[in-house]
Design a protein with these regions (language model features):
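Compact, glycine-rich, soluble single-domain proteins
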Residues: 73-75, 83-91
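Short, structured beta-strand/loop micro-motifs enriched in basic residues and often containing a Trp
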Residues: 105-110
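Short nucleic-acid-contacting surface segments enriched for D/E, G, S/T with interspersed K/R
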Residues: 82, 117-124
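Short tryptophan-centered beta-strand motifs in secreted/extracellular beta-sheet-rich domains
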Residues: 124-130
Length: 180
């Protein structure tokens, strides 16, 4: 995939299938776990820390799979899916700047939920400010981010951590537990 400043859903689906470079590096999840419809802006120099910035969106469709099961007669998008979208985008950033490997969420220092996403909402906006990129021993990103709906910030995540790992094998050798 060519490095550019924005990506369509079609392009993100290619990254989910083939990886950013066509060789499997930095694959995004396939639908329905892909929680991003488009990246409107991705830059390496910018954002609150001048280390990078991502602006992306997900269109809300009233029949998204998660509304049927979370919760019956009280549909709410699970907060963990919004958080996963932030990890997905942070991992995308790592391969976008040239990192190689399979992306794995490593943690988050703090998450606050201040609202909820319902089927009647139209769009989710993700904003990610890259705080730091570490290239050795593991290619890794640290970021702060927010999730917005209807111009209101409803999730805030600080110190998101995603790493790229090479040498991960699936399935792992018999009797072994796969680790990073």
């Amino acid at each position: 995939m060519e490095q550019k400043s924005n990506y369509s859903k079609k392009e993100l689906l290619i990254v989910a299938d083939e990886g950013f470079d066509g060789a499997g590096n930095g694959k995004l999840p396939m639908p329905p776990m892909l929680m991003v419809d488009r990246i409107l802006q991705i830059i390496e120099d910018g954002g609150a820390f001048n280390k990078g910035y991502i602006l992306a969106e997900l269109d809300i469709i009233p029949d998204h799979w998660f509304f049927d099961c979370h919760f019956k007669d009280d549909p709410v998008m699970p907060g963990c899916l919004g958080l996963d979208a932030l990890w997905q985008l942070s991992g995308f950033f790592l391969t976008w700047i040239g990192g190689e490997g399979k992306g794995r969420a490593l943690g988050c220092g703090e998450v606050k939920f201040k609202g909820q996403i319902r089927p009647h909402h139209e769009k989710i906006i993700y904003k990610i400010d890259i705080r730091r990129v570490i290239k050795k021993p593991v290619f890794m990103v640290l970021a702060n981010a927010s999730v917005q709906v209807e111009d209101r910030t409803i999730y805030v995540a600080k110190n998101l951590q995603v790493g790229l790992f090479t040498g991960l094998i699936y399935p792992p050798p018999e009797g072994e537990v796969e680790a990073f």
